[in-house]
A protein has these predicted regions:
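Extended, Lys/Arg-enriched charged tracts that mediate electrostatic binding to polyanionic substrates
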Residues: 136, 223-272
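Extended, compositionally biased low-complexity polar/Lys-Gly-rich tracts
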Residues: 242, 247-259, 276-278, 407, ...
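Surface-exposed beta-strand edges and their flanking turn/coil or helix-capping segments
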Residues: 162, 218-225, 282-287, 335-336
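A recognition module on extended beta-rich or small alphabeta surfaces enriched in W/G with H and D/E
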Residues: 273-347
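The feature captures two recurrent sequence modes
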Residues: 1-216, 318-448
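Non-heme Fe(II) oxygenase catalytic core, chiefly the N-lobe of the double-stranded beta-helix
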Residues: 195, 199-239, 260
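Intrinsically disordered or highly flexible coil/loop and linker segments, enriched in small
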Residues: 145-149, 216-219, 223, 257-265, ...
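Short amphipathic alpha-helical patches
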Residues: 163, 230, 234, 278-282
Length: 448
């Protein structure tokens, strides 16, 4: 544990009064929860019976695990965790307070107004880590969603099963002091990033629709598995389902997690992955490094652009997609998400640096490349990041697979892609037949 002098210095750097970082005791938290549960002027009032049982659990000091204010139930199995609120240290509460202070400075400038309104509704901007009993009650009353605590990053199948039932998985650990970007989510990401988006009705519906879409993919996968006992066929079915899940996940990533929206002719962020990181919040709007592309998700070609574009999980994004207004997201029904994923499986893909013909540019990023440049880099053995290389191999393997497997690209994009020279395709075919490009060409699901 850091000494008090160090903690005071850290707090001062972030504009936080360390004396205000004082969590309420159990009695104070219970009084807040009791007042909350009594409210009837909300979209989803809590029944008297459920409110009584919920309050009793909190009063006994039972650790919070899965919200119990609706009839929906959820089994997290080995991934279930609990929030033992009184075990958080002063350092952890200070880390929250510093993150919130930093976020508030950037969110007020860069977040869309609908997000800011939602954050104010849930009173997230406090000086201490939220008690999930109270936060869950507030979220449920306003949106019908609830929290479910998890111990680690959970499998994609479970993550989106939660979504389909209007549960959102949240971790219980808090990042270290002054740590900005995380590869795995903490309370700062899950709560200070995602929770406000539940109050944007169309975004909350898109999240649930992704859960339902994945259920459709799982259902079809399981039906096909039941119809065969041949091991190779079963593995092929599993691989195909995972591939479809990845393409659906990309749509989720570029909207719910890292989406930008226009607000009074200015760029604003609504993606939780952006807004949970003060550094990426500024970067996503102001930096000249990433490419920003305007899309209309109600158009099939633009939704395919999302599904066929790779993304980064270890650093700030190289490409962001900008939606004109939230209403355009209403078209992301479960059936349309699945149909788009199936088409994406047959098409060439884009790396996170690619700018394609027909893309509507907000700005061109410093590290952007044309769609064909990755093929020439591969052919000439020029430096390229793993995504550029992986995407080039995948696309060339499709294009070189023979006349019987020729890909029909007509009508899938806003404008035709530049044709890949036959000399490049012929070169790749020879090299691939000799086993030069054996590496994986589909990145694993990031929610695993």
């Amino acid at each position: 544990m850091s000494d008090s002098s160090t903690l005071c210095q850290i707090a001062e750097r972030h504009g936080v009064d360390l004396q205000q970082v004082q969590p309420l005791d159990l009695e104070g938290r219970i009084e807040q929860l009791r007042s909350c549960l009594l409210r009837t002027d909300v979209p989803y009032p809590v029944s008297a019976d459920r409110a009584r049982d919920y309050l009793d659990c909190a009063r006994r000091g039972t650790a919070f695990s899965v919200g119990s204010l609706s009839a929906e139930q959820l089994d997290l199995g080995q991934y279930q965790a609990e929030q033992f609120y009184d075990r958080y240290s002063l350092e952890e509460h200070l880390s929250w307070a510093c993150l919130i202070a930093d976020q508030q400075r950037t969110k007020s400038r860069y977040a869309c107004q609908a997000y800011l309104d939602g954050e104010a509704m849930f009173a997230i901007g406090g000086m201490t880590i939220p008690d999930f009993y109270l936060l869950n009650a507030r979220i449920y009353q306003q949106t019908g969603w609830q929290l479910a605590t998890v111990s680690m990053i959970i499998p994609a199948e479970l993550f989106f099963t939660c979504h389909s039932r209007r549960f959102f998985p949240v971790t219980t650990f808090m990042r270290k002091l002054e740590q900005d970007y995380l590869q795995e989510p903490d309370i700062g990401h899950d709560v200070a990033g995602h929770v406000a988006t539940f109050t944007i009705p169309v975004v909350a519906q898109v999240m649930q629709n992704h859960g339902i879409a994945r259920n459709l993919i799982y259902q079809r996968r399981d039906e096909m598995l039941d119809a065969t006992s041949e091991q190779q066929q079963r593995q092929s079915i599993l691989n195909k389902a995972d591939e479809l899940l990845l393409y659906a996940e990309r749509i989720y990533w570029f909207t719910v997690e890292f989406g930008l929206v226009m607000q009074q002719a200015e760029l604003r962020a609504f993606g939780a992955g952006i807004l949970s990181s003060p550094g990426e919040t500024r970067y996503s709007i102001d930096s000249v490094k990433p490419t920003r592309l305007r899309i209309d998700p109600s158009r099939d070609c633009d939704l395919l652009r999302l599904a066929t574009t790779d993304y980064l999980i270890s650093e700030y994004q190289k490409t962001y997609f900008v939606t004109e207004h939230f209403d355009l997201l209403q078209s992301l029904t479960p059936e349309r998400i699945v149909a788009t994923a199936k088409i994406a499986a047959r098409l060439p893909h884009f790396s996170w640096r690619d700018v394609a013909p027909g893309d509507t540019l907000v700005n061109l990023g410093e590290s952007s490349i044309s769609t064909n440049e990755k093929y020439f880099r591969l052919m000439c053995n020029q430096p390229a990041d793993e995504c550029v290389t992986r995407t080039a191999i995948r696309n060339l393997r499709i294009l070189s697979s023979g006349p019987g497997n020729t890909v029909d690209l007509a009508g899938h994009w806003r404008a035709p892609l530049a044709p890949v020279p036959e000399s490049v395709v012929d070169w790749f075919r020879r090299e691939d037949q000799q086993g030069k490009f054996a590496q994986q060409t589909i990145r694993p699901l990031s929610f695993d």
